[in-house]
Swiss-Prot record:
Residues 38-65 are annotated as: Disordered. This is Large ribosomal subunit protein eL34. One of its GO terms (cellular component) is ribosome. InterPro entries: Ribosomal_eL34 (IPR008195), Ribosomal_eL34_C_sf (IPR038562), Ribosomal_eL34_CS (IPR018065), Ribosomal_L34e_arc-type (IPR047868). GO terms for molecular function: structural constituent of ribosome. It comes from Aeropyrum pernix (strain ATCC 700893 / DSM 11879 / JCM 9820 / NBRC 100138 / K1).
Amino acid sequence: MVRPGLRSRSLRRVYRRTPGGSTVVHYERRKPGPARCARCGRPLGGVPRGRPPRVRRLSKTAKRPERPYGGVLCSTCLAEMIFEAIAGSS
């Protein structure tokens, strides 16, 4: 029987083939969902999906796009906000 802590479905099962030819089950934490745009809710491109310790090891530029509101707004919403700001100021 598997350990009680590993019976939870919050852990995903990964099947690994060992060098001896048998298949064993490894239990891993699931990946979090994708980062989403704060305005429209679409998944953000260029933002990695990963557990915090894995993402922490990435370089700063690998964590989010290098533009204003990168990692917060999608490019479409950012373009709309810039356009609204320019149109509203004149």
